[in-house]
């Protein structure tokens, strides 16, 4: 987002600012839930082979833990990279 656009948001009426904040919050919640669901589906599919017991065995538990850690590290790295690209794009405007 460029600085002119942010300046325009500051000029909005208070009611519109509240609506924008609410929309942004809803989008953040949606994205968080989507990421969580993707993580659960991917790690469960990759790590759990059968339903032998109610609980995960040690191997499945270790696999799920590693999978989740990898997924979160990757997601954080992608987010940082997008932030770097956005910051670079904003400075070239």
Swiss-Prot record:
Renumbered ranges of motif Twin CX3C motif: 43-67
Topology within the bilayer: Peripheral membrane protein
Keyword ATP-binding among UniProt keywords: no
GO BP term, pick one: protein transport
Keyword annotations from UniProtKB, A to Z: Chaperone, Disulfide bond, Membrane, Metal-binding, Mitochondrion, Mitochondrion inner membrane, Protein transport, Translocation, Transport, Zinc
MF terms (GO), sorted A to Z: metal ion binding
Residue intervals passing through the bilayer: none
Disulfide-linked positions: 43-67, 47-63
Keyword Disulfide bond listed: yes
Coiled coil: none
Chief location category: mitochondrion
Domain comment quoted from the record: The twin CX3C motif contains 4 conserved Cys residues that form 2 disulfide bonds in the mitochondrial intermembrane space. However, during the transit of TIM9 from cytoplasm into mitochondrion, the Cys residues probably coordinate zinc, thereby preventing folding and allowing its transfer across mitochondrial outer membrane.
Function: Mitochondrial intermembrane chaperone that participates in the import and insertion of multi-pass transmembrane proteins into the mitochondrial inner membrane. May also be required for the transfer of beta-barrel precursors from the TOM complex to the sorting and assembly machinery (SAM complex) of the outer membrane. Acts as a chaperone-like protein that protects the hydrophobic precursors from aggregation and guide them through the mitochondrial intermembrane space.
Family from the record: Belongs to the small Tim family.
Subunit structure: Heterohexamer; composed of 3 copies of TIM9 and 3 copies of TIM10, named soluble 70 kDa complex. The complex associates with the TIM22 component of the TIM22 complex. Interacts with multi-pass transmembrane proteins in transit.
Protein name: Mitochondrial import inner membrane translocase subunit Tim9
Organism listed in the record: Mesembryanthemum crystallinum
């Amino acid at each position: 987002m460029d600085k002119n656009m942010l300046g325009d948001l500051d000029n909005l009426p208070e009611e519109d600012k509240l609506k924008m904040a609410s929309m942004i919050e809803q989008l953040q919640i949606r994205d968080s839930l989507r990421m969580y669901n993707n993580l659960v589906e991917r790690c469960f599919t990759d790590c759990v082979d059968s339903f032998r017991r109610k609980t995960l065995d040690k191997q499945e538990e270790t696999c799920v833990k590693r999978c989740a850690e990898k997924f979160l590290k990757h997601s954080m790295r992608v987010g940082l990279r997008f932030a770097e690209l956005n910051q670079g794009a904003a400075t070239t405007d």
